[in-house]
Regions:
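Acidic catalytic motifs of isoprenoid enzymes
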Residues: 1-274, 278, 340-345, 349, ...
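Transmembrane alpha-helical segments that form the membrane-embedded catalytic/substrate-channel core
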Residues: 212-216, 299-305
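Long amphipathic alpha-helical coiled-coil segments
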Residues: 230-231, 312-326, 346-359
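Amphipathic alpha-helical protein-interaction segments enriched in hydrophobic
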Residues: 283-297
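Interfacial loop-to-transmembrane junctions
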Residues: 315, 375-386
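Divalent metal-dependent phosphate-bond-processing catalytic cores, especially two-metal-ion Mg2+/Mn2+ enzymes
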Residues: 324-336
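Long, charge-rich low-complexity segments
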Residues: 336-378
Length: 419
């Protein structure tokens, strides 16, 4: 139960209860689905089905940008589904990836042979492509361009492994950096952000690389169990003969050294993340960008030097995720969150870790970039008396159980919003 995992964190209990009571309406407002066309409503249904985390922040964007980003996400989700489907032979998959951007202008194109869990975005691609063609030209140009470049990059890496650290950067650029670049161009096209945001592709690329590397690091076990290899060979070959050997109990010390090396590499993007977020002016765009980034550094902090990466699933608590989502709405709070998780990593750096010096250097740079006078920062700690805390925890636990039960009873099959 989510609330039990947060019992030692009173601020998480408070935020879980607040979240259940609708306290996140400013971050995740409900949409008016009744005013949408059937095809657009279906697109938001697919968005919620394929990614609840991204769906939440996408649906909170302002104005027409919301629809553009929704369609952008679904187009790339469809492309990614083709890449991930191991049942599609290469001689069929490579041309599909290279030509996928052309399907946006083919009103009847669909693919019904996928075995992936998100195959509905391929089977009903005509609905998605219809809404793509309904977008303003400036949005269509960005989405089509990024789709084309990403498809070519995915096809390139289908036939080769991620070898060097530079190739890891290149792969992550194709599958995530381009997403950051495309989103930034959409922000500027909407005029919610300045043209500079869309022009600075280096910072936008770093935003995507930080998220993608975090996911790749966290998903080591899941990926290797199905034959996928995204950890760069240049890194893991220093510690094992085969990538999957890192999961062996007798390889734990080597596995942690490799893990820490990759976490350190991912952390080098954090200064760019700080610089990028500092430029944003629209509140909905800031929330959209900041929330995944603080989730990522929280996840990296939990992954660093953690044997569970090689034994199971490493996730942050739901209460922690809700707290981050509710707090990461301004730059001061983001600085604080980044500083706190950087400090958590610092406390876990071993004297014998091979990457120790590099880790300490990048953590020092991150602390420098996010340094603010502690006296001017909003407190993230709730100082509660023992009696009040006990009563609040009991009330929150009972209320959470009641609300979860009633919500489950009331929720119908057509509820598009999800949890």
């Amino acid at each position: 139960m989510d609330i039990l995992k947060s019992l030692g964190h009173p601020e998480e209990l408070f935020n879980l209860f607040k979240f259940k009571m609708g306290g996140c309406s400013t971050v995740m407002p409900k949409l008016d689905y009744e005013s949408m066309s059937d095809s657009l409503r279906t697109c938001y249904l697919y968005l919620n089905q394929t990614s609840r985390s991204f769906a939440a922040v996408i649906q909170a964007l302002d104005g027409e940008l919301r629809h553009a980003v929704c369609i952008f996400y679904l187009v790339l989700r469809a492309l990614d589904t083709v890449e991930d489907d191991m049942t599609i032979p290469l001689d069929k998959k490579v041309p599909m990836l290279n030509n996928f951007h052309t399907f946006l202008y083919q009103d009847k194109w669909c693919f019904t042979e996928s075995q992936e869990k998100d195959r509905q975005v391929l089977e009903d691609f005509p609905t998605i492509s219809l809404e793509f063609r309904n977008l303003a030209q400036e949005y269509r140009d960005v989405i089509s361009d990024i789709c084309q470049r990403m498809g070519v990059g995915m096809a390139e890496f289908l036939e080769k492994k991620v070898g060097s650290m530079k190739e890891w950067d290149l792969y992550c650029h194709y599958v995530a950096g381009l997403v950051g670049i495309g989103l930034s161009q959409l922000f500027s096209a909407s005029q919610l952000e300045e043209p500079e945001v869309g022009r600075d592709t280096e910072l936008a690329n770093s935003m995507g690389l930080f998220l993608q590397k975090t996911n790749i690091i966290r998903d080591y076990l899941e990926d290797t169990q199905v034959g996928r290899a995204f950890w760069p060979q240049e890194a893991w070959s220093q510690f094992a003969v085969r990538l999957e050997d890192l999961a062996k109990p007798d390889k734990l010390e080597s596995a942690l050294s490799c893990l820490n090396l990759l976490v350190t590499d991912a952390l080098r993007h954090v200064p760019d993340v700080i610089a990028y977020l500092s430029r944003l002016r629209n509140q909905s765009v800031f929330n959209f960008c900041a929330i995944p980034q603080v989730m990522a550094i929280s996840t990296l902090s939990k992954c660093y030097n953690n044997p569970m990466v090689f034994q199971g699933v490493v996730k942050i608590r739901k209460g922690q995720a809700v707290t981050l989502m509710m707090e990461a709405t301004n730059m001061r709070a983001v600085h604080t969150i980044i500083s706190q998780h950087s400090q958590e990593i610092l406390q876990k750096v071993s004297l014998t870790d091979p990457s120790r010096d590099k880790t300490l250097d990048i953590l020092a740079l991150i602390r420098e970039k996010s340094a603010l006078s502690q006296s001017t920062l909003p407190s993230r700690t709730h100082h509660l008396s023992p009696m009040y805390l006990s009563a609040a925890m009991l009330l929150a636990a009972l209320s959470w159980q009641y609300l979860s039960t009633t919500a489950a009873q009331a929720q119908g099959p057509g509820n598009i919003q999800g949890q």
